[in-house]
């Protein structure tokens, strides 16, 4: 039977529950256990697909096409299990499901209430998510409950977790609480009172944490840990100091050295083999001892909140690990390029334009792409970054003045990028869209395998085919492809059924690639990713061309 670890947070949000949960999962997996993770989000949105990146950060896309919380990206990067739609659910999905059942008459005329109907539905969703991995033979499911203890939105989830623990009995569930121990500079000391109150709030609900992960900007002294232990009624060895580090990939070792996995295994009645974190040690060693250094310019419009590009930033770090390179990422506001020009790009070793939506800042991105193309700077365009590369090429090389996307200019004289109106999803179902379709849940999403054109740069990177995840509404317009190809652009991959362009490249450029998919979602620190590794190697070569002494 699957055992559960519920991870909660207190005092403030954004403490790193997702990293903590993923790190614990990585340790347990290294001990031979079959582990999966779930994220429970207390907002009423059905999913984060239509939420602003400034509000929510990145939307992570799973293989089966679900738009999910960015923490699922951390989960996939830390353990081998692939996340699916059932690994992330929201209050909106829970209420939607309960209301459908009520309309069907499933509750036989009963008054539908938060307890038991909503809490029972949450428990069913949790069990379904746990059973989806390992052919239903999951040993441990780690369940991260979003929000902060004390918030009204999280109460049904916490109550459901309490009920699950009670119903399953002894050694079936454990609770790990992540909390903040702030340092007050004026007093020159760490303050434990917020943590004490947070645990008291959790105990009022009926949840007694097996371990406290105490976040601080420094190591927490033993006397402060003892104070937390006494007032929280948590054993001293289960009060864990979690301090700031320069890489999230150091967290598994930090937690293991303080025995968090032993505490959890004891609470669950498990006796797995010892942990083997040698892979994580090797990753950290590669991070701390690079042989090279490159500077990548990421040109976007959400650069004030880098969480919007979390998987992409991590993919570049992974490529650095596998090329023994320190990858410095400079986030450049595309509107700043529109105002000040491309002079600020001259020191970069490579340029990247990520995915995005909307017209704002697109001309700055196009200017950056033109700079990369004309100056032989390695360029990687992802999703919108590929579409804008095609627009730039159409305007300045193929002679299609005024070329644009119908997303930005519905009456463009040359709509080289246009709305996808019909395509086939993973199950073979034909999807149809138009400009009046709902925004939520209407994009082309999920993984798709596509053949690659022989003799291309894409083939040298991926091999004969590519299988990556998508999240977009617009595509390169096939009507214009012959004119673009005649001008020197190569479409190096297409979808097998609809013949939609998936990859483009410029053979006369040192390294210029655009991809309609999101390769960052499949990059992991263990394996890296062939596209990003090739990109970083091209950036190193670019740097050496500019400065042979570097």
Curated annotation (Swiss-Prot):
One of its GO terms (biological process) is 'de novo' CTP biosynthetic process. Residues 1-270 are annotated as: Amidoligase domain. GO terms for cellular component: cytosol. The keyword Lyase does not apply. The active site is at residues 383, 518, 520. CDD domains: CTPS_N, GATase1_CTP_Synthase. ATP binds at residues 14-19, 71. Residues 295-545 form the Glutamine amidotransferase type-1 domain. Residues 431-450 are annotated as: Disordered. L-glutamine binds at residues 356, 384-387, 407, 473. Mg(2+) binds at residues 71, 144. Pathway: Pyrimidine metabolism; CTP biosynthesis via de novo pathway; CTP from UDP: step 2/2. Keywords: ATP-binding, Glutamine amidotransferase, Ligase, Magnesium, Metal-binding, Nucleotide-binding, Pyrimidine biosynthesis. GO terms for molecular function: ATP binding; CTP synthase activity; glutaminase activity; identical protein binding; metal ion binding. Disulfide bonds: none annotated. CTPSs have evolved a hybrid strategy for distinguishing between UTP and CTP. The overlapping regions of the product feedback inhibitory and substrate sites recognize a common feature in both compounds, the triphosphate moiety. To differentiate isosteric substrate and product pyrimidine rings, an additional pocket far from the expected kinase/ligase catalytic site, specifically recognizes the cytosine and ribose portions of the product inhibitor. Catalyzes the ATP-dependent amination of UTP to CTP with either L-glutamine or ammonia as the source of nitrogen. Regulates intracellular CTP levels through interactions with the four ribonucleotide triphosphates. This is CTP synthase. It comes from Bordetella avium (strain 197N). The lineage of its organism: Bacteria, Pseudomonadati, Pseudomonadota, Betaproteobacteria, Burkholderiales.
């Amino acid at each position: 039977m699957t055992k559960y670890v519920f991870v909660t947070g207190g005092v403030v949000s954004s403490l790193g529950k997702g990293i903590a949960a993923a790190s614990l999962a990585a340790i347990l997996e290294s001990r031979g256990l079959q582990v999966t993770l779930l994220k429970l989000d207390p907002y009423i949105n059905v999913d984060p697909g239509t939420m602003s990146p400034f509000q929510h950060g990145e939307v992570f896309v799973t293989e089966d096409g679900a738009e999910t919380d960015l923490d699922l990206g951390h989960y996939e990067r830390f353990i081998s299990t692939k996340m699916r739609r059932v690994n992330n659910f929201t209050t909106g999905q829970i209420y939607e499901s309960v209301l459908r059942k009520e309309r069907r008459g499933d509750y036989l005329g009963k008054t539908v209430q938060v307890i038991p109907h909503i809490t029972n539905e949450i428990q069913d969703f949790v069990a379904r998510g746990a059973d989806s991995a390992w052919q239903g033979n999951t040993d441990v499911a780690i369940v991260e409950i979003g929000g902060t203890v004390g918030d009204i939105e999280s109460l049904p989830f916490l109550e459901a977790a309490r009920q699950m623990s009670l119903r399953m009995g002894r050694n079936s569930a454990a609770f790990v609480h992540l909390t903040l121990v702030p340092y007050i500079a004026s007093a020159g000391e760490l303050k434990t009172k917020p943590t004490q109150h947070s645990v008291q709030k959790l105990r009022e609900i009926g949840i007694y944490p097996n371990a406290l992960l105490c976040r601080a900007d420094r190591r927490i002294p033993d006397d402060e840990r003892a104070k937390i232990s006494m007032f929280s009624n948590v054993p001293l060895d289960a009060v864990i100091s979690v301090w700031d580090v320069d890489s999230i990939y150091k967290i598994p070792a930090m937690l293991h050295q303080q025995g968090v996995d032993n505490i959890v295994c004891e609470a669950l009645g498990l006796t797995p083999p010892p942990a083997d974190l040698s892979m994580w040690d090797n990753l950290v060693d590669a991070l701390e001892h690079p042989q090279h250094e490159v500077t990548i310019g990421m040109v976007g419009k959400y650069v004030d909140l880098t969480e919007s590009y979390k998987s992409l930033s991590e993919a570049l770090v992974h490529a650095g690990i596998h090329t023994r390179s320190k990858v410095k990422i400079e986030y450049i506001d595309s509107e700043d390029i529109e105002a000040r020009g491309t002079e600020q790009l001259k020191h970069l070793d490579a340029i990247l334009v990520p995915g995005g939506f909307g017209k704002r800042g697109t001309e700055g991105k196009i200017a950056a792409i033109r700079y990369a193309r004309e100056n032989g700077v390695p360029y990687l365009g992802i999703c919108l970054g590929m579409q804008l590369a095609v627009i730039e090429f159409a305007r300045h090389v193929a002679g299609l003045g005024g070329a644009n996307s119908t997303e930005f200019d519905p009456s463009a004289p040359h709509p080289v990028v246009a709305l996808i109106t019909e395509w086939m999803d993973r199950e073979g179902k034909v999807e149809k869209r138009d400009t009046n379709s709902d925004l939520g849940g209407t994009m082309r999403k999920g993984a798709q395998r596509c053949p690659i054109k022989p003799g291309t740069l894409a083939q040298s990177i991926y091999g004969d085919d590519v299988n990556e995840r998508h999240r977009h509404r617009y595509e390169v317009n096939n009507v214009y492809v012959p004119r673009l190809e005649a001008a020197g652009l190569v479409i190096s991959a297409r979808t097998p059924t609809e013949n939609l362009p998936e990859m483009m490249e410029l053979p006369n450029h040192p390294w210029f690639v655009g991809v309609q998919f999101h390769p960052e979602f499949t990059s992991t620190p263990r394996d890296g990713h062939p596209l990003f590794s090739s990109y970083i190697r091209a950036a190193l070569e670019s740097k050496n061309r500019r400065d042979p002494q570097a």
